[in-house]
Amino acid sequence: MSYYKRQVTVSTDSEFKRKSGDIIDLGNKLYSRGLLNATSGNISSVLNNDPLELAITASGVDKGNMNAEDIIIIDSDGTVTEGNGKPSAETLLHLAVIKNTEAKSVIHTHSIWSTVLSRIYLPEGFLSLKGYEMLKALDGNKTHETNEVIPVFENTQDMKGLSEIVSKYLKEHPETHGFVLSGHGLYTWGKSLKEAKRSVEALEFLLEVKGRELSLSEIKIQG
């Protein structure tokens, strides 16, 4: 991994400090809800569009106990331009989302229900959510009758290859609000960190409802 020092101005430094504080605060909240256990997951937010600069949580940090040193800045290639932390390999997936959607912030969680459902629906390659009022919390959805399709991708250590698959899907399906990796977790995003937070709360709620419905249906059938 190569490093270089970015040009820092008063405005960019101030924005980085503000975004870092917001990311740390959100990390604490999501950790307390059991969505970012054991140093899992990552949170990112765009600092600058041209050239692209992204503030993102460093690899291996406890999201419930972060400080300013745990947030780094990367460029459009994933190269660290500010900070001493190491970028997660999953940084490439954040960049894939940022480059192929209108997103300015990306959140990756490791919840129980997204992990369970990702394994169940991997053979189909997607899961559908329809008929839930919470669907209207997702940007652009006007009705609970929206058929929200969540693609399920097979997990792999080849993050470059996976990021290319995700990029292709997002280009072909711009209405997408999130995706899951099998046995891994959820990725979702928004035009701001606030919107990304709303998206992750809505989708995690919907995935839990979906999982509980499946569990209760199985019990009813057996009974």
Task: Give names to the regions the model predicted.
Residues S2-G223:
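Glycine-rich flexible loops
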